[in-house]
A protein has these predicted regions:
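Eukaryotic intrinsically disordered, low-complexity regulatory linkers and tails enriched in Ser/Thr/Pro
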Residues: 1-126
Length: 126
């Protein structure tokens, strides 16, 4: 008989908190100095990144949602957002299953999730 994976159940429940926070930001914006640091696995299925960012961040990347983001769109399984890199706008899509960490330093809030990746050479953990 298969055991209950409580860590997976907990991670899924906590990811719904992230989803709800992003939905709030999608419809209400980020007020009162709120800003999100979102760390995710760049090689997970469903992650959409420009090629130059995949090269720069082969395993893990952290994005910041604060002032310069547009078109935040949240669904049950993922979120997408337009961010500016090197002065140009790019669309990023991140499945919630790829999340490693979510922070809102304005209220000293942080969630961490199980990290299961095979490291590659030059892994840059920002």
């Amino acid at each position: 008989m298969k055991k209950i994976d409580y860590q997976k159940l907990l991670d899924n429940a906590l990811k719904s908190v992230v989803k709800d926070a992003l939905i709030h930001a999608q419809f209400n914006g980020l007020g009162d100095g709120a800003h999100f640091f979102i760390t995710f696995k760049t090689r997970d299925p469903g992650v959409v990144l420009p090629d130059f960012l995949r090269i720069r961040y082969p395993d893990i990347m952290t994005i910041v949602l604060q002032y310069s983001y547009n078109n935040l769109n949240v669904s049950d399984k993922e979120f997408g957002v337009q961010l500016t890199f090197d002065g140009r706008p790019f669309f990023i899509r991140v499945p919630f299953s790829a999340l490693i960490e979510f922070k809102d330093p304005s209220v000293d809030f942080m969630l961490s999730f199980q990290l299961k990746i095979a490291p590659s050479a030059g892994n840059d953990m920002e």
